Every structure is written in C-alpha cells, then in structure tokens.
Amino acid sequence: MANSCRCAGGLHDRSRYDEVVLDVMLYSARLHETVARQNSAVIVAMARMIAESFDEDGKVLLCGNGGSAADAQHVAAELTIRYRSSVSRPALPAIALSTDTSALTAGANDLGYDNVFARLVEAYGRKNDVLIALSTSGNSASVTKALDMAQRLGLKTIALLGGDGGEMKGKADLELIVPHSGSADRVQECHITVCHVLVDLVERMLGYRC
C-alpha cells in the first residue's frame, strides 16, 4: 500500500490502541450520561407523542442522510417488525424515507436532492403522523425541508440533532441535541440509543410490556 498519507503506527502497537478503545468508549459513555440527564423528560415526551400517534391510527415517518438514514431504517424496522423477541405485539407502522431508491433518484433528478424527503412527506404524511428528523449537524437541507413540510401538513415533529442544533434548532415540536461537534459518530451513537429507549417506552405506554 502507498504510505504517503499514512501516520506512524504499526500493526502490533497494542498499548496505543488499547488507549484508543478506552478513550472512544469511555467518552461515548460520558456523553450518553450527559444526554440522559439533560433530556430524560423530553425523551418521555417524544415517546408519548409517538404512542399517541399510534393510538390514533397514525404512523411514524423517519428521515436522515448517511448514518442517520441507517438509523432511520433501523428504528423503522424495530417498530414494524420487532424490538425484542420477548415482547409480542402488533406491527407499529413506520416508514424510513431513505429506502426507496427509485423515489430518491427521481426526486433528486427532477426536484433536486434537497427536496426529496419533503416530497415523500407530502406523499405519505397525514395529520396524526409523527416525523422523526435525524441530523448530526442540524444543517441538512433535505431533512430541514422535510421538517418544514411536515409542519405545513400538521404532522407532529421530533428532531434528533447534534452540535449546537444548527439550522434545525427550534423548528420541531420536540428536539434533542447531543452536545458533541466535529464528528458524526458519537452523535449517531447517542441518537440510536435514544431511539431504542423511545421504542421501549412506546411499547410500555401502549401496554405491550410492563
């Protein structure tokens, strides 16, 4: 392999890499604790909003880009299929807007990528639905426009953000901002944990688990 851009290291520098493991995982754990302590009430409120939507025959729409798109798909699968095998419940309707490549590419080609999620919210969104918008920076134009469309249509909105919240700060009915800037990874780790807690709480609120 070419080494012009490689740092000094080595495959067998175990002590150095042990430090990396500890630094990354312990920082992530501290960040999780901060998010939990600062946002427990809003997380409960988000879960209640979602549970009330399901109780009123609504559904959840989710959108994000890159790793946030993967998180959106992850959560949609846990709602529609199953979160834990020990809990028997009906399917809960959730759609990740990043999964239909034909719609995404048609929208990007015909309307511009910034408008693709908004167009899908316009197509699928109804009054009792909830949009969960994920952006590690809070500055994703496509996610911001989806949030704007959801509000115009009367959907309830949740934003999971990072850093200082970016342009999306203050736009959603409920928001959670992970206080980490400079990289998306630590923010995404907190987002997916929050989403798991949301699914857990929604199942409890709907009476599917104690």
From Swiss-Prot:
Gene Ontology, cellular component aspect = cytoplasm
EC number(s) from the headed UniProt entry: 5.3.1.28
* UniProt organism field: Chlorobium chlorochromatii (strain CaD3)
| Sequence ranges assigned to domain SIS in this UniProt record | 50-208
**Region forming the signal peptide:** none
- Which GO BP terms, alphabetically? carbohydrate metabolic process; D-glycero-D-manno-heptose 7-phosphate biosynthetic process
One Pfam entry for this protein is SIS_2
Q: Which cofactor does it need?
A: Zn(2+)
The protein's name is Phosphoheptose isomerase
Its EC top class is: isomerase
Q: What does this protein do?
A: Catalyzes the isomerization of sedoheptulose 7-phosphate in D-glycero-D-manno-heptose 7-phosphate.
